Amino acid sequence: MIYADENVWVPVAEGLRRRGWEVTTAVEEETLGHTDEEHLEYAMQRGWTILTFDDDFLSLVEGGYASSNHPGVIFTSQHGRTVGELVKRIDSTLQRHRGRELTGEIVFA
């Protein structure tokens, strides 16, 4: 399962679903307004890979907050990109990593 934090636009999550990915969002999980640490803990407790547009999140993970126990983070920047472009980039990244464990990894889309 992919957990799209509150920085990920809902239409991006919907586009990934249309491509067959299991995605839930911070809106659906009612975690809007949570800190990055709380989003990370929420995903870790459920074993969900996190999708984020928030580069502060990278500092949190790279800084050792969750050591190597986090279920994986997929990061991409939304700046200057359309929803369609983002969906394609993220889908392509997910396809390349299909079946591979992302625990402790940060993947850039």
Where are these regions (language model features)?
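Conserved BB-loop
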Residues: E22-H34
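Short beta->alpha connector loops at strand-helix junctions that form conserved
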Residues: V27, F53-D54, T76-S77
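Acidic, PIN/NYN-like endoribonuclease modules and their adjacent C-terminal/linker elements
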Residues: D5-E6, V10, E14-R17, T31, ...
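Short beta-strand scaffold positions
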Residues: Y3-A4, T52
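Acidic, metal-binding active-site segment of PIN/NYN-like and related structure-specific nucleases
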Residues: D36, M44, W48-G63
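Mobile, glycine- and charge-enriched loop segments
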Residues: M1, R19
